[in-house]
Structure formats: C-alpha cells, structure tokens
A protein has these predicted regions:
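A generic structural signal for tightly packed, nonpolar segments enriched in small/aliphatic residues
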Residues: 1-134
Length: 134
C-alpha cells in the first residue's frame, strides 16, 4: 500500500473482525491458525468518470505450508507463489494509476497465511508433539 500513496488509488484494508461479520468464512478459516490474521485489500482506481468499472481479484496467500495437511519438503519451495495473483492485481492497478489510464478498476486481494502458528488451537505447543514416556 505504500507505493499506492503516490497515486490516486483509494485503498481499504478489511480486517479479520469485519471479514467475520461479512461471512467471509473461506478466507477466515484458512488463515485463522496463523499468527497473522487474514485480511482483504480493496483498491479502487478511477481514471474516467464515464467508464464502467472492471474488477480484478487475485489470491494473496503469502505463505502456504498446507496447514494441518503439510506439503512434502520438495514442494515447500513455492510456498510464496500463492500470492502471485494478488501481486499481479496490485501491480496492474499501480501501473494503470501511474500512467493515468482512462479506466475504472477495483482490485480485491484476499490475504492470509495457510500456516499453523505455535499458538494455534489451545495455545499449547505440546498439543502438536508426541511424547514417549520411559
């Protein structure tokens, strides 16, 4: 959002509590076990009052380990790739605004981590560890 400050793009960050109130369970369910709560970024660029509004939506999963169903080690290399759609939407809107293109675009980026934090669930680390008693 820092780069958008130098443009006419209006940015709105929808936080976890509002996402819950809106019934956005798909997003909040994926991200609720992470230390960083899910959110959604809405960007509005208005370059022409007469033009229709085009919508762009891009997935912004910033870290996808697979949650409780962990991915195999070999596929962990691409865990940041699930944010590529969101990055493309943000870049497109920035480019449109920076070049003052005569269009109207709204971009939506639902963002979360699909990663289990140490404090997920009961908040106890030993919930995820098995112990062998001698």
């Amino acid at each position: 959002m820092e780069h958008m400050k130098e443009t006419s793009v209006e940015c709105e960050l929808i936080v976890y509590s509002k996402l819950n109130a809106m019934g956005m369970e798909a997003l909040t369910s994926v991200g609720k076990s992470s230390e960083n709560p899910p959110c959604m970024l809405v960007m509005r660029y208005r370059g022409d009052e007469e033009a229709p509004v085009t919508g762009l939506v891009g997935k912004g999963v910033t870290c996808d380990t697979g949650g409780y169903c962990l991915k195999p080690a070999g596929s962990m290399m691409g865990i940041k790739g699930d944010m590529a759609g969101g990055a493309a939407v943000a870049a497109a809107i920035y480019a449109l605004a920076a070049n003052q293109v005569k269009v109207n675009v709204t971009g939506v980026i639902p963002m979360c981590e699909n990663r289990i934090s140490v404090c997920a669930g009961s908040g106890r680390r030993d919930r995820f560890l098995w112990r062998k008693e001698d």
